[in-house]
Regions:
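Short active-site oxyanion
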Residues: 2-3, 43-45
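FAD-binding subdomain of flavoenzyme oxidoreductases
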Residues: 34-38, 45-187
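Glycine-rich N-terminal segment of FAD-binding domains in flavoprotein oxidoreductases
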Residues: 1-32
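Short, glycine/charge-rich beta-strand/loop segments that flank catalytic centers
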Residues: 8-17, 71-78, 188-190
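Gly/Ser-rich phosphate-binding catalytic loop and adjacent alpha/beta segment
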Residues: 17, 40-41
Length: 190
């Protein structure tokens, strides 16, 4: 009926996206908050869009696993998918798009579709899953997702390094990445 629908998750709104600028309905997805199944042997989890990232990592952590994208705020998985959330760990782990394997979506017409698959490698057909990730809810609303998980690192080390200028800092970052140490997070603070 040409009524705009805007999905809303945890309201972290770091991007300002859940504002219905053209009127219409705001659909609160926060009660669709079930972790449907964790499959440790497959490094996968099935979730509803209202699951909070910290809650997912708490439950996956019981199996020695975690969902790496960390936008800073405790966003919902649906919001992270809608915005292709990333964070300081992107340098090693990538963004949300790198972990979404399968989606169940409701299109603006009301039609329910399934994209992707649970196989780690699939090269047949169009990659509709990647089309929806980062579309900010404009192409449809996520109602379920299958995500890849990673093993929790056995060791962690944090360091703060001061530099006199940006050139020295960027040179050190390039050297660190080139060394093969594989830092999980890097952040430049003024």
């Amino acid at each position: 009926n040409n009524v705009p629908a805007t999905p809303w998750g945890a309201g972290t709104s770091t991007e300002g996206n859940p504002v219905p600028t053209f009127g219409g309905l705001v659909i609160n997805m926060s009660r669709m908050d079930k972790i449907l199944e964790i499959r440790p042997g497959d490094l996968q989890v099935d979730v509803q869009p209202g699951v909070l990232r910290k809650e997912l990592n708490r439950k996956a952590g019981r199996h020695g696993l975690f969902f790496p994208p960390d936008p800073g705020a405790d966003a919902t998985i649906g919001g992270m998918i809608a915005n292709n959330a990333s964070g300081v760990q992107t340098v090693k782990y990538g963004a949300t798009k790198d972990y979404v394997m399968k989606l169940t979506m409701v299109l603006p017409t009301g039609k329910v579709i399934h994209t992707g698959c649970k196989a780690h490698k699939s090269s047949s057909g169009y990659d509709l899953t990647r089309l929806f990730v980062g579309s900010e809810g404009t192409l449809g609303i996520v109602t379920e997702a299958t995500l890849k998980l990673c093993g929790i690192p056995s060791h962690r080390l944090a360091a703060t390094i001061n530099f006199n200028d940006l050139e020295s800092a960027s040179g050190a970052v390039a050297a660190l990445i080139g060394s093969g140490l594989g830092p999980a997070a890097l952040e430049l603070l003024p």
